[in-house]
Amino acid sequence: MSDDQELGITESKEYNTGEWYAEVVQKAGLANYAPEGMSGFIVTRPRAYELWERIQGHLDGLFKDTGVQNAYFPLFIPESYLEREKDIVEGFDPEVAWVERAGNQELEEPLAVRPTSESIITPYISQWVRSHRDLPLRVNQWASVVRWEATETKPFFRTKEFLWQEGHTAHATRDDAWAETMRRLDQYEDTYEDLLAMPVLRGAKPEHDKFPGADTTTTVEALMP
C-alpha cells in the first residue's frame, strides 16, 4: 500500500456535504465522471448498476402483477411530434438536446433526444385503442432520458442523462385514471420503504412544480439525512 493512499472518507458530511457525497460515490465504486467535454454525464459502474437492476426487478414485478406491459419507443423524437405537446415542450425546451445532422447530411427535420416520451407514445396509444374493449391500456418503458441541465449536476441526483421508467395508461373514465395513479403511487412508496428502507412522504406537487402539461403531479419525497 502506498504511503499517500487515502483510506476512508476524508470530507466532512456536516460541513462540506457536496464534496462528502462525491467522495462517497467515488470510493464506493458507484460511478465515474464521463470524459472531459461531457460535463454532467456519468459512467454507472457495475455495483451501482446492480442496485438499479434490483430496483428495476422489484418494480417490474409489481407492474406486471397489475396489468402493465413493457414496450420500447425510439430514442429520437421528431420536432413535429414535440410541437403537438406544446405544454410539455415549453416546460422542457431549454433542456432538449437536438440531432440535426446524420454524418455530413442535414436532417429534413430535427430530432430531439428523448427528454420524456409522452409525445412519441401517445400517438401509438391512440392507434392501439379502438374501442372501450381495449381499455384500460397500460404500457411501461425502461429507458434513459437526456435533459441538458444548466444547473449544477451531481451523480444519481441530477445528471444530463439518467435511467428511469415511465408508465403511460389510457382509461375509460377520469375516476379509473385516478385509481391507477394511486395504485402506482402505492407501488413507488412500497419500493422506497420495503426495498430501500427509506421512509417517504406522499402528496401532490404545488402548481409551480407540476410536470409540464400535467393536471396533477403526485409524488413521494424522501428527506435527506
Regions found by a protein language model. Name each.
Residues 2-225:
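TRNA-recognition modules of translation machinery and tRNA-sensing kinases, especially anticodon-binding
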